[in-house]
Structures are given as C-alpha cells and as structure tokens.
Amino acid sequence: MKRTGKVLAILLALAMLLSVTAFAAWDVYGSNANHNSVVDSAPTTATTTALNSYIDLSNGGRGWDGVDNVPVMETVNGTTYAYVLYDGYSSYGGQLAKINCSAATPYVVWRKQVSAAAGFQLSTPYLDTTNRAIYIGASNASVYNNVAISSPVALTAGTAGTVTIGGLSLLTAANRVSVPVYVGHTSVADRGTLTTEGTATIQLGGGTPVNLTLSTTQSSSGTTYKIYEQATYDADGNVNGYDYYYYINHSVTASSTENATLSISVTLNGTGTIESVSMFANKGAVTKVSGIDSTDASGVTLTSVVSSVNGQINTPITRYGKYIYFGTWSGNTAMQYYQVDVSRTSFRTKTMTGTAGFYWAGAVQLGDYIYFGGDSGYLYYRDSNNFDADTEVTLITSDVSGAGNVRSTIMTDGTYLYFTSQGGYLLCYKPNATTGKPEYQWSAALNATSTSTPTKVGDRIYVGVYSGFNKGGVKCISASTHAVKDVIAVTDKNNFPVQCSIVVKGDGTGTDYLFFNTNSGSSTTENANYGCGYCYSYDGTTATQQWASRSDTYALGGMACDNGIIVFGNDYDHLYVVK
C-alpha cells in the first residue's frame, strides 16, 4: 500500500473493527469446540491452476520446518481470510500471516514476526472472532509488552531516526529485536528500481552495539539485511505495485538485565519509516495478537499472555468460556498443561503436571471437565473450575495393551470421547456422569500408527494413519460395530503418510468427501506425489480420488476449510488455497 494511503487505511481498519461481521469461521483446531472436522461446503472439484499454484511465505528461506500446524480461518463481510502461523527461517523467525483467500489470486494482507528465531511452529492458534484477536503458542516468543512505539517514526535522508525505550527488566541477557523499516512503493512498471539503503545500530542494556547494513544488492547474511519486496494487490487479487522493507531481526546481548535501555538508530539515503519495534526473549510463550483487521502489519500488536514457558508448545490452543488451554513437551520429562484466564488483563494461570509431556494433544471440554491425552499413554481429566487440583488419571494401556502415546486432540460427539494413539488404536471413552472420570468403552486396532484426531459423521469415524516415512492411508471405523475398513490401504500407496485429521463433507450415510494432506518427501516431479493435498470420495465401500495438488514437500499440519475454501501449507512455507 502506498504511504499516502497509510493514515486512511488505519482509520478504515478502526472503522471496520466496529462493524466486522464474521459469518463463518474455522477458529480452532478441528473447526469447532468438539474438534470434529466436518464441513458443509468444500471444493470437491478444483482447477489445475489452484492445485499447482501456491503463496510462497518463505521470503527465500528453506528448512525442515515451515507451516506445521493448521491455519485458522474466518469469513468477514463476504471475504474469507486465513491466518497462518509458520517458521520464517533464520532471517525472519516465527511469523503470522493474514491471507485474503477470496481474491481471484489469493494474497498476503500482512505478516507479523511473532517469535525470535527459526524453529518448528506446531501449535495451532485460536482465533477469537468476537474480540478480534488470535492466541498463538511458539518457541522463543516471550514478547516484551513494554517494547513498542506508539506511532511510526519518520526517516529523512541522511538523518538518523531513533527509538529509545528504558526501564526494561529482561528475562534473558540475549534477546532478539525486530524492526521493520518501510522504504517505499513502486508501480509494477518500476519494480526493483528503488535504491534506498542505509545502516542501523541496536544496543541493549549497556551491551556491545550491533551495527547493521541495509542493502538493495547484497544478500542477507550476518549483519547485512537485503531489501524485501512485498507485492500489493487490488480488490481482485491483481498485483498493482510493490512495497519495500528492511526486516531487521537481530540478536542483541545486554550486559545488565535490570533497568536496561534499548536504543535503535536507523539512517537511510532516502526516506522511510520505522514501522514498529518488538523484542523477544528466547523462551516459549503464548501471545495475544490484536489488530488483526488492520490492512498492514503496522496496526498488528503483540501482548504477552504467558511468558517463560518451559519446553515446546506443541498442542493446539483451545478455548472454553474464559479459559484457553495448551500443553508443553520436552522429551520424556514430566511437563505442564495450562489453563489461562484470558478475560483478565493479568491472564491468571493454573497448571497441572503430567506424568510425561504433551504433543499435539489438544484439550476438549465435555460437561464441567476438560479432557486431554499425553505421552506414555495417559488420558487426563480436570474440573474446569478447579484445574490445578490433584485428580486421578487414566492409563489407557491398562485398557488397551500397547496403546502408546496419545498424540491426537480429543474429539467428542457430545457423549463420547474419541482419540487415536501411536500404538495404532482408535479409542472411545465416556465420562462418568457423577465424577467426570473417563471410562473405557471400546477400541479398534488400526494396524498402523496414528496421530490423527478422529472425524465422525453418522456411524463413520475417519482417521489418518502412517507406517514409517513412506506408507500411510485413511481408515473408516464403524462407531456401532467398531469394524475397520480401508479407505486408502497402507499397502496401496507410496509417499502417503497421513498424520493430520481428515476434513469431511458429508453425513456418513451416502458419499462422503475426505480432504487431507500427506507428510512425505520432497519432489516437484509431476505425479511424484510428495506432500500433496487430496480430495477423495468414499461411499462406504469404494474410494475415488477427486483431485490432488502438485507434488511438493512434507505437509504435516492438515487442512482448514471455511466458506468452501481449503487451505494448507508445508515445510517450504508454500500455502495452497483451493476453491
């Protein structure tokens, strides 16, 4: 967006905030409070263009991690948006991007740095459509609430623009400072002609100043940052120009952690603007992202909810009433599950310590109780009004030998609890009507590993499975007879590990449509079938492929669907929008 329109855009965003109408949303893992990924509308056919094109969020980076969780989505005033948490690799840290999915060519509305450094982002966010915010859990993401600027800082040629923030109490001596510097806009015809360069200096807590070079030609490396180009779009998704930024994301070390001062100085050979300032400690954290209706990242703000979290936040963030829930993981160590009251600005926190850690194991509420699985084969339950009280836990291996880790989110149909285990089982429990304790009902052997949260339509329960790094498929289990059928047999397909949940369009009585992606390999060779997104029809007997996206790379997290639009990403930070 051109700078002359920035003030108008901010005022427009504020006006929109007061009039936003969200008609639909996939706002949490599994799309709803039950985590049952059933949708009324989804693309059962797709164009070749949609299946072979993607939004590249990587900014040129590459790694073993990218989009490794499920996006959240909403439709506002007729336009469908996706919010994607992903790894921006070493240059950009963890990022949150807002995508306009309804445009003829989907595009990035804004992107915001949300963590200090590169790393897997496995926690699916929670979208608060009422209060217009997103809660994210990430590694190296303890944001300092008091490191911010109230308005952008204008830069003139040859004169240093400065930001000074004092009185800081630092969580760690080493921290990472994020400073996006806007340097101009060009038309499509003048693309790449901007010559604005400069220098920057960052100092924290009396430590050694870090001197940086901002260059239009040199590659980003060490203390050098190359200019970044971001296309701008018209209402139909057509490119109508380019914005240019220097995205400073640099580690600085303080010599004193108390009453520390952060000093930033930027000098350009042209005009520009310091858009915002953020600083992150190298600790896990949950952050509230506000200003999501802004038309660019300058209006997006970060507020620390829980800082200095030990271990990785690898579970989805779920919400019931005024509480959000998430778990942590660190190898075989006993770790914590959190309940956080987000109705208060103080974000009151309660925790319980599990026998082991929590990985992909999102929580569900049924009645007054919260249920979630864990490693070493445990099923936990807690009274939502007394979350940190000692409560008996259920060891599922006492009911099913060899059940293994529970690395799926719990799904409920309102009566029963369903989940899978890495030992290769679909399990069903029912809460005791008096005590809330989950009581074993039945299980079904899948004959393959599963981390897939079950999806239930009618009598059919669908789960994804995998065997090793190459084989996998989809199973259909009868809720009444517990019989297991192959939708896609593990022995039938190569490059087909399905670790995600299955999105289903249908009612389980006729033909259902199943949507999922595969976590396998890397290849752009046509028909190589690495890391694809798929749609299959299944009538209870026969499965037929309806479409498949291009061969790409590992796609772990799974799909989201809203307003008939499917989105999913992969480890190359490629985001597919299928409609």
Question: Where in the sequence are the language-model features?
Answer:
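Solvent-exposed serine/threonine-rich low-complexity stretches and specific carbohydrate-binding patches
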Residues: 197-200, 211-219
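Bacterial N-terminal signal peptides that target proteins for export
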Residues: 1-8
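Short, surface-exposed loop motifs enriched in S/T, G, D/E and P with embedded aromatic residues
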Residues: 155, 209-216, 224-227
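Bacterial N-terminal signal peptides
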Residues: 10-19
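Extended amphipathic alpha-helical heptad-repeat regions
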Residues: 183, 229, 246-248
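Extracytoplasmic/lumenal domain signature
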Residues: 25-148, 222, 230-243, 256, ...
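Autoprocessing Asn-cyclization modules and mimics
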Residues: 146-199, 203
